Regions:
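Conserved SAM/SAH cofactor-binding pocket of Class I
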Residues: 1-50, 155-254
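Conserved SAM/SAH-binding loop
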Residues: 57-60, 236-243, 310
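Conserved proline-anchored active-site loop of SAM-dependent methyltransferases
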Residues: 67-79, 187-195, 249-261
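N-terminal auxiliary segments of SAM/dcSAM-dependent transferases
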Residues: 74-134
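A short glycine-rich, Lys/Arg-flanked "PGG" loop and its adjoining helix->strand segment in the class I
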Residues: 83-94, 266-278
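A short helix->loop->beta-strand "cap" motif at the edges of active sites that frequently abuts
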Residues: 93-97, 205-206, 280
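Class I S-adenosyl-L-methionine
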Residues: 105-129, 147, 288-319
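SAM-dependent Rossmann-like transferase core, predominantly class I methyltransferases
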Residues: 113-178
Length: 319
């Protein structure tokens, strides 16, 4: 039997036996594929011993599925992403469907009714919205459910873009020859808000590399690069940039997640330390510098804090 799992993570595929040892859950039988939207979760499943194939893609794989199991709920993903994935499952026409819903029965029924009440309707869940920095052109950016800050500008990202665009423009005004061509690395790029705003604000050519672990973010960033006419190399990665890109960037920008005790921020900043040239500048942003500043100082001893829009932009120079 061919089974597709949607919304499951590696911890959902194991249970503890009587001795407390981890073993695969008993229902993992047959030809099972687990779809993930994030390459980190894909790698976690691949490196486990559960015997499940992992696929990481922005959309569900098309096949003649005997069973599709979907795990979702308000604490697992946004309602819009749940509905988007449920619609994709409906369009796959699996022989059987099972929903594991972590939430109220009323919310479960409401989610299912959106498909059952109008089964022939195919919704477009993408969003297009404007963003700009002072003195820069207005960009129309596209995002998809699952992207960070889908349908709206993230204030922290906008604060970061405004500070970096302003500082780079001033630097080029006074020392343009030393900064040409300009190489920018945007890590955790999402749909590309920060990278594209900074690149579009500069008069001199910019080489833009963007990295994200989420396939829908990568899909959106590639689409926006093409639509905006801003050349960008967009990479799907949960471990920063490849070694051949070390010591090659003038500027690093990142808006690292605050959860997981800043472990993801460590990956961001370790990448920045590797990827920047000597004299390159690392910019990160957070709501409160108290948590991120000590992490950044582990990689860059000197940290300057620039306040913008109620956020703290942390600036460091690689020695």
């Amino acid at each position: 039997m061919k089974t597709l799992l949607v919304g499951y993570k590696v911890q959902d595929l194991f249970e503890a036996d009587r001795r407390g040892e981890r073993r695969p859950v008993p229902w993992l039988e047959g030809d099972i594929t687990c779809h993930t939207l994030d390459i980190y979760h894909c790698h976690a499943i691949e490196n486990s011993s559960c015997g499940v194939k992992a696929v990481c893609s922005p959309h569900l794989p098309k096949d003649d599925w005997d069973l599709v199991k979907f795990k979702t709920g308000p604490k697992l993903m946004s309602g819009e992403l749940s509905l988007d994935l449920l619609q994709e499952i409906h369009l796959l026409h699996p022989k059987r469907f099972e929903l594991e819903f972590g939430g109220r029965e009323r919310d479960r029924n409401d989610l299912l009714s959106k498909i059952k009440d109008d089964p022939d309707r195919v919704r477009d869940f993408s969003a297009v919205w404007p963003a700009s920095v002072p003195g820069g052109q207005k960009l129309m950016l596209t995002s998809f459910p699952g992207c960070f800050c889908h349908r709206r500008v993230d204030d922290g990202g906008l604060a970061l873009a405004e500070v970096v665009a302003r500082e780079l423009s001033a630097a080029k005004t006074f020392n343009a020859s030393a900064l040409q061509p300009f190489n920018i690395l945007d890590m955790g790029c999402g749909c590309g808000l920060v990278g594209f705003l900074v690149a579009a604000s500069q008069k001199l050519p910019v080489r833009l590399v963007m990295v994200d672990s989420h396939t829908r973010a990568v899909e959106a960033a590639k689409l926006n690069a093409e639509k905006l006419g801003i050349p960008a190399e967009v990479l799907l990665s949960d471990n920063g940039t490849p070694a051949q890109m070390d010591d090659s960037f003038d500027v690093f920008v990142g808006n690292p997640p605050y959860y997981s005790d800043y472990r993801i921020a460590d990956i961001f900043l370790e990448t920045a330390q590797r990827a920047l040239k000597s004299g390159g500048v690392c910019y990160t942003v957070c709501k409160n510098a108290d948590g991120l500043e000590p992490v950044q100082r582990r990689y860059f001893p000197d940290v300057e804090i620039i306040r913008r829009r109620g956020y703290a932009v942390l600036k460091s120079v690689k020695n």
